[in-house]
Amino acid sequence: CVLDCVTSLQNGADMIWIETEKPHVGQIGGMVNRVREVIPNAKLVYNNSPSFNWTLNFRQQVFDAWSDEGKDVSVYDRANLMSVEYDDSDLARTADEKIQSFQADGSREAGIFHHLITLPTYHTAALSTDNLAKEYFGEAGMLGYVSGVQRKEIRQGIACVKHQNMSGSDIGDDHKEYFSGDRALKAAGEDNTMNQFG
C-alpha cells in the first residue's frame, strides 16, 4: 500500500486514499509517515468506512489499552464487547469519546487531510426505512410517519417537507401557465396541500 501511494504521488496524484482493516489512528499514522519519508507533503484521504464495526473496534482498543496500563478489565469479556450489557459502561463511554474525536485525532496524529464516509446515505436510508416500516405497520400507524419523519422535517426546516416543490411541480406549473394562461390546471396554487407547510 505504501509503495502504491508513493508511486501514485510521484506520477501526478495530489492526494492518496488508504484503506486499513480497522480505524486505528496509530496504524494510519504509521502508514502515512512511511509515505512522507519519500513525499513529505503527501495528503491523505481516509475512508471512515461503514464496513468497520466502529463500536467493537474502539471498545477493543480501549480494552487493550486499559489492559496494557494494568487497569482491571476483568468485568469485561473482550470477545463479547458488542453486548448491550456494556453500552452504559465506563469502557463504552471511553470508546465513544474516542470515536467522537477520531477525525480530530486522525488529522492531528495521523496526518489525515480529508475524512469521508463511503455510502453513508445507503445506511441512513436503510435504517430510516426499516424504522418507518416498523412504526407505520406497527402500533403507531400513521403517527410513526408523522412523528418520525414529517414533524422532524418541519422542526428542522428541511426543504423536502415541501416535496412537490422539490420534485419540480412548480416548474411544471410554469410551463402549463405559459401555454394555457389563466385556464391552466396547476399542481400548485392556493388550494395546494403544500401550502400547509408555510
What positions do the PLM features span?
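A SIS-like phosphosugar-recognition module
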Residues: T55, H123-T124
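Short acidic/histidine-rich active-site segments
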Residues: I117-T121
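Acidic, glycine-enriched catalytic cores built around paired aspartates
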Residues: I154
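TerminUS-proximal long segments
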Residues: G157-D170
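Polybasic, proline/glycine-rich intrinsically disordered low-complexity segments
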Residues: G138-R151
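Alpha/beta enzyme core
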Residues: C1-L116, T129-D130, K134, A140, ...
